[in-house]
């Protein structure tokens, strides 16, 4: 692997990857950037209210242009990957995985969400594998996520990826997932 002096340098941003889903479809994984506002807005419009709530723990409640813009313009501590599919010759965002590092750069909070029509095909797993790889490459030592305790799909994906879970002591409706990245 390439040594990178700054974990957020341009050299740390990959061009893209391809991923084959369980059903044989191909997706393109790439970093999200400011030019993706319309893809992100369309993606948000396909999420159910429950999906928005799971993904953003209730912080984003709509698919407005402002919400899409906020999700495509990052500060240097944030990184996000999109899963892009070709549907009838058009690019369609079908999933997103992102993280935000702590102030000291040793930990990051992560999240993943997948278009309901593309769930249970492997999109979330592929996105998270690449997100975990990028976090390791950038020297992050621990990744964590907080999600609704009722989110069964998230629990299964987290276990598959090697995360350990524990109930959130301050909120019984939430669970915290943690993954050590320095092994």
List the predicted regions and their residue ranges:
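Long, contiguous binding/interaction regions
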Residues: 1-183
